[in-house]
A protein has these predicted regions:
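An N-terminal, globular interaction/scaffold subdomain
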Residues: 5-35
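C-terminal functional regions that serve as terminal interaction/effector modules
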Residues: 212-260
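A contiguous, surface-oriented mixed alpha/beta subdomain in the mid-to-C-terminal portion of proteins
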Residues: 64-220
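Structured, contiguous alpha/beta core segments that scaffold functional sites
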Residues: 25, 33-82, 100
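Extended intrinsically disordered, low-complexity coil regions enriched in Ser, Thr, Gly, Ala
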Residues: 32-56, 151-169, 256-260
Length: 262
């Protein structure tokens, strides 16, 4: 009974990592739909199955028509002070929001919370392995952002810099700054090739996010197979399941898009 209870506690703690991720995606979806005024589509896509695990009322969020109503829907959660700070610093103009600033603040809250939990609830090697899982995801998200902004928007360094998550795994801050400041996509990829990710990401790829997903998948699978920590193994398992779901969604979206454009 003691072992069973301990295992249950581990699963409950690690499952919260996934729940928080989904909650933030819902809040960001709500903000995007306020900007684009597509509330009906948002309501239809709500994952109501997760309501028993969520820290706020999902349907309440679905009814939000303004930033104030989003904040009201998440009142009493860790997201409320984050959104209020953004609202004060970047006040909305009607339905117009500085979306990337809100996204950065929420994702920073997410990764900071995960790192604090890992430090508080694990020790030694298990803590280091959880930190690797968490910070690598943030770092690869930064690389994806740099690639997209340079490739599709020809964004300058200042515009990219303010979107960077403040977490590092295998890169040094100086290396990330050099890639942010690279003059174009090719210069960015050349700098990336000199980093620990260089041997794992094909610079000729036509699908950069697929390459970074592969890096994350292999690192996560390695910890799933070889870690001796229940917390790490379960977190790795949940993250792999999440990645598989993301892949399925991408395939469905690609097929739907192809069908619509034929």
């Amino acid at each position: 009974p003691i072992k069973s209870s301990a295992a249950s506690d581990v699963y409950k703690r690690q499952y919260q990592y996934i729940v928080m991720d989904l909650e933030i995606e819902l809040i960001l979806s709500s903000l995007r739909n306020i900007i684009s005024d597509e509330q009906e589509d948002f309501v239809a896509s709500l994952p109501t199955f997760m309501q028993p695990y969520a820290s706020f009322n999902i349907l309440g969020l679905a009814g939000a028509r303004s930033l104030d109503e989003v904040i009201e829907a998440v009142a009493g959660t860790a997201y409320e002070p984050v959104l209020r700070r953004c609202q004060k610093q970047y006040p909305p103009d009607g339905n117009t929001l500085r979306y990337t600033r809100y996204e950065l603040a929420l994702r920073t809250c997410y990764f900071s919370t995960l790192l604090e939990r890992a430090k508080r609830e694990t020790r030694g090697r298990a803590s280091a392995e959880l930190r690797e899982l968490i910070t690598m995801r943030a770092e690869l998200m930064n690389l994806n952002t740099i690639y997209r902004m340079k490739t599709y928007f020809q964004a300058d360094a200042d515009r990219i810099r303010v979107t960077m998550l403040p977490f590092y795994s295998r890169l040094r801050p100086r290396q990330l700054e050099e890639m942010v400041s690279a003059r174009d996509t090719q210069a960015f990829l050349k700098l990336l090739s000199a980093t620990p990710y260089g041997r794992r990401i094909d610079p000729e790829t036509g699908f950069f996010e697929g390459e970074t997903d592969g890096v994350r998948y292999r690192a996560t699978r390695r910890l799933l197979r070889f870690s001796t920590s229940p917390e790490v193994v379960y977190t790795a398992f949940m993250l792999l399941r999440s990645m598989e779901t993301e892949d399925i969604v991408r395939i469905i979206e690609a097929v739907s898009y192809t069908h619509l454009t034929l």
